[in-house]
Amino acid sequence: MTTNIVLETTMGSLILELYTTHAPKTCNNFTTLVRRGYYDNTIFHRIIPNFMVQGGDPTGTGRGGSSIFGEKFEDEIDPGLKHTGAGILSMANAGPNTNGSQFFVTLAPTPWLDGKHTIFGRVKSGMGTIKRMGLVKTGSEDRPVEEVKIVKARVVEEEEQI
């Protein structure tokens, strides 16, 4: 069974396909946080052109967020999964085994992240939205000048057509 997540953002919708076989604990964390409304009305606090779009911090600072397992949990690195191009969904971290709630989507190949960040999905639909996000004007700490927000995140139920 494939798990899909819809992120309704201020710039358009994204459908994320989660890699539940490769990163079950990470996908469980993300899906549970989505169901709890954890990501609703949070911002993408860091956007770097030709690199990535990062969100998932309820404080909006890039220093907050926690997992359903407590503050942090361990990496689930699958050597078969690589940051090969735009649209890879991966966990943001502050070093090994420091996953919480923050995530990023790549805007280009980022091979230097391989083996350091848990890849747990991909953008299934909405690459145009992600690419537009990557072009927004940013200020200090790569923070968008105008907020880019997740208005609502939801799990697509099995019977639902997407």
UniProtKB/Swiss-Prot annotation:
GO terms for molecular function: peptidyl-prolyl cis-trans isomerase activity. It catalyses: [protein]-peptidylproline (omega=180) = [protein]-peptidylproline (omega=0). InterPro entries: Cyclophilin-like_dom_sf (IPR029000), Cyclophilin-type_PPIase (IPR024936), Cyclophilin-type_PPIase_CS (IPR020892), Cyclophilin-type_PPIase_dom (IPR002130), Cyclophilin_A-like (IPR044666). Transmembrane segments: none annotated. Its EC number is 5.2.1.8. It is an enzyme of class 5 (isomerase). It comes from the Eukaryota. The keyword Phosphoprotein does not apply. GO terms for cellular component: catalytic step 2 spliceosome. The keyword Isomerase applies. Residues 1-155 form the PPIase cyclophilin-type domain. Keywords: Isomerase, Rotamase. PPIases accelerate the folding of proteins. It catalyzes the cis-trans isomerization of proline imidic peptide bonds in oligopeptides. Belongs to the cyclophilin-type PPIase family. PPIL1 subfamily. This is Peptidyl-prolyl cis-trans isomerase-like 1. It comes from Gibberella zeae (strain ATCC MYA-4620 / CBS 123657 / FGSC 9075 / NRRL 31084 / PH-1) (Wheat head blight fungus).
